[in-house]
């Protein structure tokens, strides 16, 4: 028995899919047409369109930017200065809502030729920090970055500033450096120093930011704020809170 094709319920006046129109116009495959669209190289009546599901009407003009190529958009990595209280998981307020053109901090470093909608699809957060914490957050589409930050997570140094209150126990700073015990687990030696009154600087290796609260509690301190400044060789630097930038091709964790 031959199956009936799935019915096309699209209203007749909804127009034609952009990729179909473009493929016919350029005499190329539908996939090549989609790649032109994803690269931000397709214009409808002079306006750039990157949404594959876009439909066009016969009277509209579809054009392709000069020099455009039908190539896959290379994966990118985004660096976000996450504000305290924002989450990269489920829930609100969502850090994903901060990834807007208005919050793109370009600075003085070269950036990709142009920002594309494709850059914000299938981004994966890595080495996340607790929701109450702020600071450097990494989101990537790049499998090489994903492997690096996953496989080398225990060896990657992370620098954090912990805002604390309370009275530290005698030799508490040395105990933090020597590696305290949490839930029966002995933590490795790390570098901890006073940055200023009420602020401890942690250089973590083999320890993750979410463990700092228990470490502080073990020496009589209450953690009231946490900010991650650096992961490996990538620092927060001048990235403003709530803003983001692209990881540049020459930068390495």
Describe the predicted segments one by one.
Residues 2-253:
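Basic, flexible Lys/Arg- and Gly-enriched helix-loop patches that mediate nucleic-acid binding at interfaces
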């Amino acid at each position: 028995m031959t199956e009936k094709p799935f019915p096309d319920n699209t209203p007749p006046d909804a127009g034609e899919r952009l990729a179909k129109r473009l493929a016919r116009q350029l005499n190329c495959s539908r996939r090549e047409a989609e790649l032109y669209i994803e690269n931000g190289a397709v214009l409808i009546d002079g306006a750039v369109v990157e949404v594959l599901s876009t439909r066009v009407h016969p009277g509209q003009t579809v054009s392709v930017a000069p020099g455009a190529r039908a190539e896959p958009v290379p994966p990118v990595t985004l660096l976000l200065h996450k504000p305290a209280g924002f989450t990269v998981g489920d829930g609100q307020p969502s850090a994903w809502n901060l990834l807007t053109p208005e919050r793109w901090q370009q600075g003085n470093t070269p950036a990709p030729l142009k920002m594309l909608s494709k850059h914000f699809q299938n981004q994966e957060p890595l080495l996340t920090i607790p929701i109450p914490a702020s600071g450097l957050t990494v989101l990537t589409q790049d499998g090489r970055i994903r492997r690096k930050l996953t496989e080398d997570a225990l060896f990657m140094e992370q620098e954090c500033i912990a805002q604390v209150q309370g009275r530290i126990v005698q030799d508490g700073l040395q105990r933090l450096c020597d590696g305290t015990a949490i839930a029966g687990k002995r933590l490795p030696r790390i570098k901890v120093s006073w940055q200023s009154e009420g602020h401890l600087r942690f250089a973590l290796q083999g320890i993750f930011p979410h463990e700092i609260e228990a470490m502080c509690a073990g020496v009589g301190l209450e953690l009231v704020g946490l900010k991650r400044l650096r992961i490996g060789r990538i620092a927060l630097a001048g990235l403003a809170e709530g803003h983001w930038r692209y990881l540049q091709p020459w930068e390495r964790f």
